[in-house]
Structure formats: structure tokens, C-alpha cells
């Protein structure tokens, strides 16, 4: 996974060149985290790679489909997501080489590489589950699969979200976050019915329903738009949105014009 920015800048010289280019299956970057040289966001055949030559490249398989054109402009470069929702490639602490150029209010944001090769920045954070942050070591042998729910999507058995040993799933009609290693229930909706599904609404509210009847809601609504619910590395579930910035590498070349994608 990515490093917190303060930690990354302290340990950068010690770890550069030691990370495998396929070292992570994460495809979400949170505010305050960075991708350093050799690290990636990876979702299926798509990979956003921060390379040792300072360039940020989006790959489809082994084919580059977009780049930030920052190659050769430093040897201590990293990708970061700022508290104003701006995505930046920097060298050193403050020298910006590339920017998404879209800024919002100070808060917590999330960058997602989806399964179709699109990048999106969502924020601010609208809601978070009430359980405490988990601070134990994650199971490195557990493969991270699907851990993001997009607005308009339903989560119903047997589908579940899973990040390492954390799972968001239904136990009968009760939506729970569970530590799969210890079998502990970290959070739950305490809902009860014969059949249920969870849905992330287009106003950002997370709901549990039975045949369209509302059984539970997060009670945090925003303006209509695309939102995401993310099962985090600390065992909590966060909702971010709406979508602030997006980029589809399939629709841009590797020219400098592709360095500043569109605002939503």
C-alpha cells in the first residue's frame, strides 16, 4: 500500500529501488498518502505507476496509455493527494512537477483507479463507520479483491467487499464489517429481515433495504453525483464524494495536453 507522506519523505532514500513494480494490488490512494518510485495503483490489467525516472504512467497491460510527462525531472519524485483534493507529482517536499489543477475545500479525499482504467478523485469524506481504527498487522498472504462500492451499485449475498482480512458482508440481513482472521465483528447495522441488500445512493447515503423498504441509512446526504464507499486498511468503511475530477487514459494521448484532465 502507499505510505503516509511524512513517513515517505523520511524513508525515501532507504527504500527506493527495493519495491517490486507489482508490489501492491491497491487501487485507492487516500489524502496524506503517496506513491513513491516503484509503487503502483493496480486494478486488473490497469496500473498507475510512479516510476524511478520520475514519470507517472498509466498502463493497460504493458502498454502505456497516458503519462504526466515528468520523466527525467528528478530522482526523488512521488505522487500525492493533497487535503484540497489536488493530485500532484512532486520532487522533494514542495516542488510540483504536475498537477490535476482541480482544488476543493480542505478535507479527506480518495483517488480511485477503476476496472476500466479511469482515474477519479472523490470527496470530501461524507461518512465513516463508527468502529475504532484497527492497528494490527494485516495478513499479507490475503489477496485484496473488490473493496470499493460505487453509487448505484448493490451489495447483496454472496457479493462482499474485502480488503486483506477485513470483509463487508451480510450475515443474514445484518451488514457487518468482520475481521476474517479473528472472526470479530467490528461494526454492524443490526438489521433484520428475510433478504436484504446494501446500496450506495447517488446522494452519498449508504442504505440497507428489504424489497425497497429502508431498514438502515447512514443519514449523510450530499448533492447528487458519483460517490464511492471504500473498505479501508484500518477496518473502517468510508463514503467519499461526489466525483471532483476524472481522467480516462483511453481518450488521451501521451502528449502534454493529457497532463491536466477534466473537472466534474
What are these regions (language model features)?
Residues 2-264:
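Beta-rich ligand-binding surfaces for carbohydrates and other polyanions
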Amino acid at each position: 500500500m502507499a505510505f503516509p507522506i511524512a513517513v515517505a519523505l523520511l524513508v525515501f532514500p532507504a527504500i527506493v529501488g527495493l519495491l517490486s513494480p507489482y508490489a501492491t494490488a491497491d487501487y485507492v490512494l487516500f489524502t496524506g498518502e503517496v506513491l513513491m518510485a516503484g509503487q503502483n495503483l493496480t486494478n486488473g490489467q490497469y496500473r498507475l505507476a510512479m516510476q524511478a525516472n520520475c514519470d507517472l504512467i498509466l498502463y493497460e497491460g504493458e502498454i502505456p496509455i497516458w503519462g504526466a510527462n515528468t520523466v527525467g525531472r528528478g530522482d526523488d519524485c512521488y505522487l500525492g493527494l493533497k487535503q484540497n483534493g489536488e493530485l500532484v507529482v512532486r520532487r522533494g517536499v514542495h516542488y510540483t512537477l504536475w498537477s490535476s489543477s482541480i482544488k476543493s475545500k480542505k478535507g479527506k479525499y480518495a483517488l480511485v483507479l477503476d476496472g476500466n482504467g479511469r482515474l477519479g478523485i472523490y470527496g470530501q469524506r461524507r461518512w465513516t463507520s463508527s468502529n475504532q481504527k484497527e492497528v494490527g498487522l494485516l495478513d499479507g498472504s490475503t489477496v485484496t479483491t473488490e473493496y470499493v462500492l460505487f453509487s448505484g451499485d448493490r451489495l447483496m449475498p454472496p457479493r462482499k467487499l474485502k480488503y486483506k482480512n477485513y470483509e463487508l458482508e451480510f450475515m443474514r440481513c445484518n451488514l457487518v464489517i468482520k475481521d476474517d482472521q479473528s472472526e470479530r465483528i467490528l461494526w454492524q447495522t443490526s438489521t433484520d429481515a428475510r433478504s436484504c441488500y446494501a446500496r450506495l445512493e447517488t446522494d452519498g447515503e449508504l442504505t440497507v433495504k428489504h424489497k425497497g423498504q429502508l431498514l438502515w441509512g447512514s443519514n449523510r446526504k450530499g448533492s447528487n453525483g458519483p460517490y464511492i464507499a471504500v473498505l479501508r486498511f484500518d477496518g473502517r468503511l468510508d463514503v467519499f464524494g461526489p466525483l471532483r475530477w476524472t481522467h480516462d487514459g483511453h481518450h488521451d494521448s501521451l502528449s502534454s495536453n493529457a497532463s491536466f484532465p477534466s473537472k466534474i
